[in-house]
Amino acid sequence: MNKIKKVVIPVAGKGTRFLPITKTISKTLLPIVDTPVIQYLLEEAVQAGIKEALIIIGYSQNDVINYFNTESTYVQKLSKDYEEIKYIKKLKQQIRISYVFQEEAKGLGDAVYHAKAFADKDDFALILGDDFVFSNGLSTYGIGSLCKFYEKNPNYYLGVQEVPY
């Protein structure tokens, strides 16, 4: 059976439309209620059965790496008392997260090209770092529905969603 096992999430943009807050925090870490967008995107990938994620980050986005770092002594102490930290540990057990730096912003095509070694000739899902689809925990929504199509007929699919203004 054909399954998508990898996802690429480019988040290397500068977030200029969200200035001044994005001077200090990456756009993908901006919260929706109490959870950053990047966490929702990884949860969506896990619900779709994806096991590996590559997050493409820009030169000043170490905060994205730090968000998912559960190894520091400080985080270890926090995880004893706060379920939220334990949840990130659990998420990391469900999907292997790796990172690559896009040193110069040359657009989406260049960002995806940085995933060449990660993809290693496998087909993969691409979730844009600012393309949030609320799924209510349904695995057949968003990227999950595209993965289901792929399982039945391995081809290339594009998901779109109307954004009312």
Predicted feature residues:
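Short catalytic helix/loop segments, enriched in acidic residues and glycine
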Residues: T24-Q39
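A generic "binding-loop/recognition-motif" signal
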Residues: K14, I25, S60
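A generic structural signal for alpha->beta connector loops
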Residues: S26, Q94-R96, N153
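Conserved beta-strand scaffold positions in the cores of enzyme catalytic domains, especially
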Residues: L29, I97-Y99, Y156-L158
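Conserved N-terminal catalytic core of the sugar/cofactor nucleotidyltransferase
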Residues: N2-I9, R17, T35-L126, V133-L138
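A glycine- and small-aliphatic-rich helix-loop capping segment at beta-alpha/alpha-beta transitions
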Residues: T24, T28, E71-V75, G142-L146
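Conserved core of the sugar-phosphate nucleotidyltransferase
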Residues: F134-Y165
